[in-house]
Amino acid sequence: MHQDHLLSTTQLSREDIETILDRAAAIEMNPDGWEAQYSGTVLGLCFFEPSTRTRMSFDAAMKRLGGRTIDMGSVDNSSISKGETLADTVRVIAGYADAIVLRHPSEGAAKLAAEFVDIPVINAGDGAGQHPTQTLLDLYTMRENVGLDEITVGIAGDLKYGRTVHSLAAALSNFDVRQHFISPESLQLPRNIRYDLHDSGSQVREHTDIESILPELDVLYVTRIQRERFPDENEYQRVAGQYRVDTDILSHADNNLTVMHPLPRVDEIAPEVDTTEHAAYFEQAHNGVPVRMALLDALIGRAK
């Protein structure tokens, strides 16, 4: 990996992705061998939006590498509540930390932050834009279950506002993957992303129902409807609950189908699916630690 920051999956080549995933696999096989690798290193956690998995797995990843974390805490308890700008906030934190993990409600925030600091910035979600570290653990999970070439992936739910979808679709274009996008018409993949996928030569099809395409899929990637991104609550209510994966629907799927979800789920996947062989979303969340350890090693190690 040759970049100073990770802002978008569009900056990653297949080689970049495979290098990080290979390193994550090595870490998972020998997690104890990394404990003193980054003694004295500090990772700044700057979350302007709620987070459970991303925040905690980055915290665990840095500590398992032998480093420490400092957490900005909630926006209400920081100087942002007094009107401090993002640029000023990251400039200050860059004086305390060796890298910054940033989540922000505004698309493009991570790219902006990277312009003001000379330490690595990792985009942990920028509004409806990108979530590249989620994609890396998604790809790791896919590779462990079905591989990353000659597979068919269905991505269902909120494709318009879902940043995990935007990142994943771009990254999958580096591999031999047939991508099927399943959503209500009002939540289709943004036009610019569709154009980019076609320009990359990706095999892409769009659908409005899951059942018709389910038998063809190796992976079904389900996402929640991003209620917090909707400008109109009525629009959200019209599309909420349209896609729900349960054991009845999965009876139409191949026995080897892998069901994934970036979490948190609301009601997109019934709890009864959790105990089936299809469910991989908790494995997916678990993979966040070794993958983010590998990413921190790639970025901070290079910066040092």
From Swiss-Prot:
EC number(s) per entry: 2.1.3.2
EC class: transferase
Alphabetized InterPro entries for the sequence: Asp/Orn_carbamoyltranf_P-bd (IPR006132), Asp/Orn_carbamoylTrfase (IPR006130), Asp/Orn_carbamoylTrfase_sf (IPR036901), Asp_carbamoyltransf (IPR002082), Asp_carbamoyltransf_Asp/Orn-bd (IPR006131)
Keyword Cell membrane: no
Pathway(s): Pyrimidine metabolism; UMP biosynthesis via de novo pathway; (S)-dihydroorotate from bicarbonate: step 2/3
Keywords: Pyrimidine biosynthesis, Transferase
Subunit structure: Heterooligomer of catalytic and regulatory chains.
HAMAP family xref list: Asp_carb_tr
Name of the protein in question: Aspartate carbamoyltransferase catalytic subunit
